[in-house]
Amino acid sequence: MMQDLRLILIIVGAIAIIALLVHGFWTSRKERSSMFRDRPLKRMKSKRDDDSYDEDVEDDEGVGEVRVHRVNHAPANAQEHEAARPSPQHQYQPPYASAQPRQPVQQPPEAQVPPQHAPRPTQPVQQPVQQPAYQPQPEQPLQQPVSPQVASAPQPVHSAPQPAQQAFQPAEPVAAPQPEPVAEPAPVMDKPKRKEAVIIMNVAAHHGSELNGELLLNSIQQAGFIFGDMNIYHRHLSPDGSGPALFSLANMVKPGTFDPEMKDFTTPGVTIFMQVPSYGDELQNFKLMLQSAQHIADEVGGVVLDDQRRMMTPQKLREYQDIIREVKDANA
């Protein structure tokens, strides 16, 4: 189908070009004839005025007839326009005198004038002639648009992955909201640091003496302490050793451990300590610890000292109690 359409278009184009050529040639001839008629009339008027010139024309009638025959041959050689340009000016003069009685005979010489204006129509004639010569060439440009169509097809293929890339871009900000700003565990770390305390008191022998191991063991057991973890004694919630440990008792001498067999054991003193917060009521546990320390000191003949190993005073006891309350309130 495409080939048939091409042939039809070529034929129609050729016919149109030929029609244009014929029409142009016909119109050019028509214009030339009109111009030719106007010019001889003007010249004839001038010739009538000149009597001397008329006599010369009558003498040259025979020559004019010969030149008329040449004019008849001129249309056959219409292509040689440039060579005939100088001659037509002299050829027209004699025929005009004879042309007065023979006006119809002057029509063939009209072809002599076209050489002057002939190059103008010949130029458009050559242009359309070149066009049919290139008419078979349009088949090549028909193949060229076929290739861009194929090239245009992959373009949307490349444009398709572009939105896909845009779809991946929003995926990146999705990973941006990281849970890093969640720094809430920091206050959790503050609680143990700010509100942990250890209440310490000592039971020591008088200056220059030591506590007897056997007496110390009996007083410790009477106060409700039981030997246990870390090789030290612990005071539990229940006197039989059950329940959580409320406070503990260690040797004042490093490493602070005891040997259950304390018959031959002596020491300058022992240390009783309680960690706050602790199980139950810390103030009640503190009172129980103070009572145990006083009981042991009375049994072994020692004294109760504070954490600086100074004599225990009522002010120091109130200070211990204030510390316990602060920790208790902070952990409430």
UniProtKB/Swiss-Prot annotation:
- Gene Ontology CC annotations of this record: cell division site; plasma membrane
| Ranges facing Periplasmic side | 1-6
Q: Which SUPFAM superfamilies match?
A: Cell-division protein ZipA, C-terminal domain
Q: Where are the transmembrane segments?
A: 7-27
Ranges of Acidic residues compositional bias? Answer: 51-63
Show the ranges annotated as biased composition (Low complexity): 99-115, 123-150, 160-175
Annotated SMART domains: ZipA_C (SM00771)
Q: What compartments host this protein?
A: Cell inner membrane
Q: GO BP, one example?
A: division septum assembly
Give UniProt keywords alphabetically. Answer: Cell cycle, Cell division, Cell inner membrane, Cell membrane, Membrane, Transmembrane, Transmembrane helix
Q: Which residues lie on this side of the membrane: Cytoplasmic?
A: 28-332
Q: Where is this region: Disordered?
A: 42-190
UniProt entry tagged with the keyword Repeat: no
Q: How does it sit in the membrane?
A: Single-pass type I membrane protein
Domain of life the protein comes from: Bacteria
Identify the HAMAP family for this entry. Answer: ZipA (MF_00509)
Reported function: Essential cell division protein that stabilizes the FtsZ protofilaments by cross-linking them and that serves as a cytoplasmic membrane anchor for the Z ring. Also required for the recruitment to the septal ring of downstream cell division proteins.
**Cross-referenced PANTHER family:** CELL DIVISION PROTEIN ZIPA (PTHR38685:SF1)
> Which family is it part of?
Belongs to the ZipA family.
> What is annotated about its quaternary structure and interactions?
Interacts with FtsZ via their C-terminal domains.
Q: What is this protein called?
A: Cell division protein ZipA
Please report the organism this UniProt entry assigns to the protein: Escherichia coli O6:H1 (strain CFT073 / ATCC 700928 / UPEC)
